[in-house]
């Protein structure tokens, strides 16, 4: 075998090794796995910031179970091919306005189990491709702006369960034309005018509630688990088991 052919075979073997999935070579960040050319899995790596070396053409980015406190405002501008982003169970306290834009291709975004405190107007930048948004299990999330989801015309599933919401303006939901599923259970709702409007909207749109929340209370035809957190005086005929929200898991910060 000629030296030229031998060298060619060696070079080809080396290239195939570097391109193999999950080895951290090529365009894959050193601390992550890349099971296919457009997926980067950096879950549970103890990361305190976004890893370096994420390929620009990544489409599926898994960053769950780390300690990441923030996402740069231009992150999704840089990674414009991204369609699936999982950031659940980190230490995010806010999402910068403009992180998503009308040009974003993101379809799935999971920000559950973080330390978010509010969802402000413009947070999601009228991203018209977003279909599923998970914001549940943020124990400090107590405020959602009426126009927080404005422009999310393709959003079908919205999860806001087990947060610290005592009120939610009905406009936050009513201006989502494609909404098919909304989760609100496990919040400490206060029975006031805002809640009455929200509850009336949910009664008119009960097909958008999860199946396990559509059960009536004592024949009143109201979704039982949605009332978790209401004081019994504000919700007559509600059993005491629904009078308090289940405890939230406290999201700890890494030790020094």
Residue ranges with predicted function:
Residues 35-84, 88-91:
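LRR N-terminal entry segment and analogous cap-like coil->beta motifs
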Residues 48, 54-57, 69, 77-81, 92-93, 101-105, 117, 125-130, ...:
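Leucine-rich repeat
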Residues 45, 66, 90, 114, ...:
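Consensus "Asn ladder" position of solenoid repeat domains
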Residues 157-189:
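Repeat-solenoid scaffold signature
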Residues 40, 59-63, 82-87, 106-111, ...:
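Conserved hydrophobic beta-strand positions in leucine-rich repeat
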Residues 3, 10-24, 28, 34-39, ...:
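Membrane-proximal C-terminal cap and juxtamembrane stalk of leucine-rich repeat ectodomains
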Residues 47-52, 71-74, 96-98, 120-122, ...:
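The feature encodes a structural signal of leucine-rich repeats
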């Amino acid at each position: 075998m000629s030296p030229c052919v031998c060298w060619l075979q060696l070079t080809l073997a080396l290239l195939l090794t570097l391109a193999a999935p999950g080895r951290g070579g090529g365009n894959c960040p050193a601390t992550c796995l890349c099971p296919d050319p457009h997926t980067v899995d950096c879950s549970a790596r103890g990361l305190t910031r976004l890893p370096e070396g994420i390929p620009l053409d990544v489409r599926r980015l898994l960053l769950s179970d780390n300690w990441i406190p923030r996402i740069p405002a231009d992150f999704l501008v840089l990674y414009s091919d991204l369609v699936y982003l999982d950031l659940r169970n980190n230490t995010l306290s806010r999402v910068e306005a403009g992180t998503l834009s009308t040009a974003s291709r993101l379809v799935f975004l999971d920000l559950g189990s973080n330390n978010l405190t509010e969802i402000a107007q413009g947070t999601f930048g009228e991203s018209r491709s977003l279909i599923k948004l998970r914001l549940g299990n943020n124990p400090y999330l107590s405020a959602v702006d009426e126009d927080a989801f404005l422009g999310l015309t393709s959003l079908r599933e919205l999860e806001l369960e087990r947060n610290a919401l005592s009120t939610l303006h009905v406009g936050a939901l009513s201006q989502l034309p494609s909404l098919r599923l909304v989760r609100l259970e496990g919040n400490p709702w206060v029975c006031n005018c805002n809640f009455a409007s929200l509850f009336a909207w949910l009664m008119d749109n009960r097909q958008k509630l999860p199946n396990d929340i559509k059960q009536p209370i004592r024949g009143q035809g109201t979704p039982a688990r949605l009332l978790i957190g209401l004081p019994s005086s504000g919700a007559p005929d509600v059993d005491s088991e629904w009078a308090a929200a289940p405890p939230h898991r406290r999201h700890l910060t890494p030790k020094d």
